[in-house]
């Protein structure tokens, strides 16, 4: 079956391209993670205490976002070249928490963001049930 062989070769080439792209993305994320580490250290020793605390909390949440994306890429390679849904939900929850920390001027927006977190937590619970769990 020459058509099947050709399709397998195309799939293999595309998988290699995807893997190389993800490794490049992981390297970039590690660089940003190191940069964020230095930024957090600078904010930690800043003399302006009020702005420093706010920036430190925001920086820590950004740090966790980088960390979660790197963990997602690692999990992709460990789990047979697929992205587990749970990790995307974790990233979504962390991103919305960061948004609440950064933009908390409107109570209505904060309530909507909190509802979105609740929906994601319910989705995470459903994704971790035995019927949907892959790992």
UniProtKB/Swiss-Prot annotation:
Compartments (UniProt record): Cell inner membrane
Pfam families in UniProt: PsiE
GO biological process annotation, one example: cellular response to phosphate starvation
Any Gene Ontology CC annotation: plasma membrane
Keywords assigned by UniProt, alphabetized: Cell inner membrane, Cell membrane, Membrane, Transmembrane, Transmembrane helix
Family under the similarity heading: Belongs to the PsiE family.
Protein name per the record: Protein PsiE homolog
Species the sequence originates in: Edwardsiella ictaluri (strain 93-146)
């Amino acid at each position: 079956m020459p058509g099947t062989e050709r399709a397998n070769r195309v799939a293999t080439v595309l998988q290699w391209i995807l893997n190389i792209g993800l490794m490049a993305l992981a390297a970039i994320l590690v660089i940003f993670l190191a940069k964020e580490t230095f930024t957090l250290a600078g904010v930690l020793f800043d003399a302006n205490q009020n702005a420093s605390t706010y920036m430190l909390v925001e920086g820590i949440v950004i740090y966790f976002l980088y960390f979660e994306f790197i963990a997602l890429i690692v999990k992709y390679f460990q789990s047979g070249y697929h992205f587990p849904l749970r990790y995307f939900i974790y990233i979504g929850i962390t991103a919305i928490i960061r948004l609440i920390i950064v933009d908390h001027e409107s109570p209505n927006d904060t309530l909507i963001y909190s509802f979105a977190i609740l929906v994601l937590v319910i989705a995470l619970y459903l994704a971790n049930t035995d019927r949907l769990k892959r790992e």
